Amino acid sequence: MSFATSLPRPTTTGAAGFGLPLATCISLSVSHSFSPKFGICNNTSLRLKSKAGSGCYEGIHRSQLAASTILEGHTPINPEVESEKIRLIERIRLMFRSMDDGEISVSPYDTAWVALVEDIGGSGGPQFPTSLEWISNNQLDDGSWGDRKFVLYDRILNTLACVVALTTWKMHPNKCEKGLRFISDNIEKLADEDEELMPVGFEIALPSLIDLAKRLCIEIPDNSASIKNIYAKRDSKLKRIPMDLMHKKPTSLLFSLEGMEGLNWDKLLDFQSEGSFLSSPSSTAYALHHTKDELCLEYLLKAVKKFNGGVPNAYPVDMFEHLWSVDRLRRLGISRYFQVEIDECLDYVYRYWTNKGICWARNMCVQDSDDSSMGFRLLRLYGYDVSIDVFKQFEEGGQFCSIPGQMTHAITGMYNLYRASQLMFPQEHILADARNFTANLLHQKRVTNSIVDKWIITKDLPGEVAYALDVPFYASLPRLEARFFLEQYGGDDDVWIGKTLYRMLYVNCNTYLELAKLDYKHCQTVHQLEWNSMQTWYRECNLGEFGLSERSLLLAYYIAASTAFEPEKSSERLAWAITTILVETIMSQELSDEQKREFVDEFVNISIINNQNGGRYKPGNRLVEVLINTVTLMAEGRGTDQQLSNAWKNWLKTWEEGGDLGEAEARLLLHTIHLSSGLDESSFSHPKYQQLLEATSKVCHQLRLFQNLKANDAQGSTSRLVTVTTFQIEAGMQELVKLIFTKTLEDLTSATKQSFFNIARSFYYTAYCPADTIDSHINKVLFEKIV
């Protein structure tokens, strides 16, 4: 009796509400218990009625049927969930298509500086009355102005600026009184605030506003120790500001000109970018007040119109928005739905890319390492030609900074530089220096529990940094990264720190998070179905009798599912996992040279007979039978029997002769995956394919050697060899990264090239990650539910 008809076909509602027929994957005639450590269904009353060969054949066939059921869309899917997924995808596409100069929240502080500008036509009234209207309409219930997240620095600065603006134009005295009451009640509490949350230039901006307030006869308590401390910081910083230098070349000081005295505006106007000073509305408003410059006016008119009277703390922020939005889609594991939009984003960024790097907005005269690092990383990942020269101006004496001349080390800036450095090509020494510097700095911050950033208040920055340090780029399996980032990403709740707190609406977005969770749950449900079918195959092939553990079975499937994770890649995923399992099973057999030769000869001879006659000649060796049946089923309907048999024959010959099994296994996996994915056989002879095959198999050999040496190094006898091998691995991975992420005129598809990196990455992951860490990853990726 067929297992699919032996009992009724119950269904279970899996993750995301996907109704799934259990009988397509699970043999219901046996009982199971669940192992919480691995998520394994352990057999408790198993009685196999078939011999290994026929049972295995049917088990493989059922696994294939399960895969094809999923692949061809026969699995019932909750229509409401599917409709919601489509809606979210389309909504995000519309967001990307509408990207312009940046969707960013309004800053009351900057709006107040704009509102202070007097009509340059000489009427005596405000140049921007709608800015005053915005201020009057946006006071909070407690009398303050600011972001919905309460940070006292932000609230005090915004509130004082708005009170000064309204008082200047003798408007809304009741609102001013309410705002001053908030300031009076809270200003002394600044001493208790975390300095990492202090907005950019706060120690300059607040004293400037207090001085303005005094001229308007506004009483601000300024005798407290906290205010005196801020004034002391201002005086110290002003003494360090090279006033002569800032008039000679662009510096980051252009972002915070408001309130500064003794400025030579004729010289500073040469440093405008599209009318603004480093895209700062408040700085530009201050310049307009002093210069009546037409370009400043045009810039502010555009910004005020865009934001209905208000202005952000920076505008435009187009480079920032384009890059960070793409980064979020990638890390959440949903970038595959938006390839066209991502290409358009990166084409836009590359249009304004320079060998000195970029800033948060296009055509800026100052660059920063944070945006430059993110841009470098994403552009290199997508095959754009970018030079490492962008990092030169951020390095001095072996240390790296966020902005030239400022040796500050914001966590996120160093984190993104670290991530960029991991995409180094051979001989890119400055990236090696950057990786060492940032890794050490981030590690020190981690061990001292001081991962707090000056640029963003996010859900779990320590977790993001920990993942980057613990799972390097070479070992970061796509589904593993997505699973962790789903918990670390705060969506709409993440808030950035500039001159004031602000939101990047297309960077920190609940819509991304909603789609990512739906997508992950769907993939996880598919993977759990496949895993159940894999266990059935394992039992019916009696692989346990050959010494293969259920943990090895699970590890093989996890590696494949964490890399080729998309539901439509079932064939590749199962072929990858099954090939890995059979390789391990065969290698674990303790056979003499003669027995190995007999094993190989039997496989070769029967494969020839079966390929010629289209039959199923039964071998005498049970494991040979398992192998032949598996190859036959993997090739079914594809016409790749001969190619798969040849790939296995090559691996078996290497095994028989005691050759390099790491290299041979990599070649076998690549051929199997490519044949299973339907890659045209002509691609196998492509020069780039051969280059990638050689580089991948070489580094996989080194990784397998490292893994074996590390296992033997417990006695401390092979540490020198481990060091040498590690150096060779790093060199090999750099060469492979260059081959994969560099576009040539006659190139392979990016998906084909990526498959080589996927195999190398899987070897790297298993070689470097401890077993207990891998076990926790398996549980998290395959079995732990997304909340």
UniProtKB/Swiss-Prot annotation:
Motif annotated as DXDD motif, chain positions: 368-371
A GO BP annotation: diterpenoid biosynthetic process
Gene Ontology molecular function: isomerase activity; magnesium ion binding; terpene synthase activity
SUPFAM superfamilies xref list: Terpenoid cyclases/Protein prenyltransferases, Terpenoid synthases
Tissue expression summary: Expressed in peltate glandular trichomes of leaves. Highly expressed in the first leaf pair.
UniProt-reported outcome of changing residue 360 to S: Catalyzes the production of ent-8alpha/beta-labda-13-en-8-ol diphosphate and of ent-7,13E-copalyl diphosophate. Increased ability to produce ent-7,13E-copalyl diphosophate
Keyword Magnesium: yes
EC number: 5.5.1.28
One Gene Ontology CC term in the entry: chloroplast
InterPro entries, per the entry: Isoprenoid_synthase_dom_sf, Terpene_synth_N, Terpene_synth_N_sf, Terpene_synthase-like, Terpenoid_cyclase/PrenylTrfase
Catalysed reaction, written as an equation: (2E,6E,10E)-geranylgeranyl diphosphate = (-)-kolavenyl diphosphate
Location(s) in or outside the cell: Plastid, Chloroplast
Binding site residues for substrate: 237, 454
Main localization (coarse): plastid
Family to which this protein belongs: Belongs to the terpene synthase family. Tpsc subfamily.
Cited function: Involved in the biosynthesis of clerodane diterpenoids natural products, including salvinorin A with potent agonistic activity on brain kappa-opioid receptors, thus conferring hallucinogenic properties. Diterpene synthase that catalyzes the formation of (-)-kolavenyl diphosphate from geranylgeranyl diphosphate (GGPP) as the first reaction in salvinorin A biosynthesis.
Name of the protein this chain belongs to: (-)-kolavenyl diphosphate synthase, chloroplastic
